[in-house]
Amino acid sequence: MNLNATLFAQMVVFLILAWFTMKFVWPPLINALDERSKKIADGLSAAEKGKAELEAAHKRVDQELAQARNDGQQRVADAEKRAVAVADEIKAQAQAEAARIIAQAKADAEQQVVKARETLRGEVAALAVKGAEQILKREVDQAAHADLLNQLKAEL
């Protein structure tokens, strides 16, 4: 094997190039690769964090929707209860008004019956007196006549 100076010079140049590369070229490349891997890791963690936040936001939205549905159903149920209560109150008022009208009608009818009886008693007493007058063909004393009428009214 013939080793000449060119080969030896090439080896020295190669070693200088290797040392120069390791000293000046390799560290920026390593730093660039490290920064790139750090950016990728940060991006992945940010994506995971965003995904977790999105899931949390979806859960909050679902909870708020469920709460809104429950509130809506509760309001509808309350409105139905109020409607039933108002209907019952109106029904009770109508029944009370009907009972009052019936009681008033009964009282009016009773009053008319009493009035008719009084009128009838007076007419019956007058007819009885007239009949007695015609039978006796004479007029009865006014005081006696009033006493007889009152007595007949009381009996009827």
From Swiss-Prot:
Indicate whether Transmembrane appears among the record's keywords.
yes
Q: Report the principal subcellular site.
A: membrane
**MF terms (GO), sorted A to Z:** proton-transporting ATP synthase activity, rotational mechanism; proton-transporting ATPase activity, rotational mechanism
Q: Could you tell me the membrane topology recorded for this protein?
A: Single-pass membrane protein
Give the GO cellular component terms, alphabetically: plasma membrane; proton-transporting ATP synthase complex
What is its subcellular localisation?
Answer: Cell inner membrane
Q: What does this protein do?
A: F(1)F(0) ATP synthase produces ATP from ADP in the presence of a proton or sodium gradient. F-type ATPases consist of two structural domains, F(1) containing the extramembraneous catalytic core and F(0) containing the membrane proton channel, linked together by a central stalk and a peripheral stalk. During catalysis, ATP synthesis in the catalytic domain of F(1) is coupled via a rotary mechanism of the central stalk subunits to proton translocation. Component of the F(0) channel, it forms part of the peripheral stalk, linking F(1) to F(0).
**Family affiliation:** Belongs to the ATPase B chain family.
**Which HAMAP family has this protein been placed in?**
ATP_synth_b_bprime
Protein name (record): ATP synthase subunit b
Q: Which organism is it from?
A: Paraburkholderia xenovorans (strain LB400)
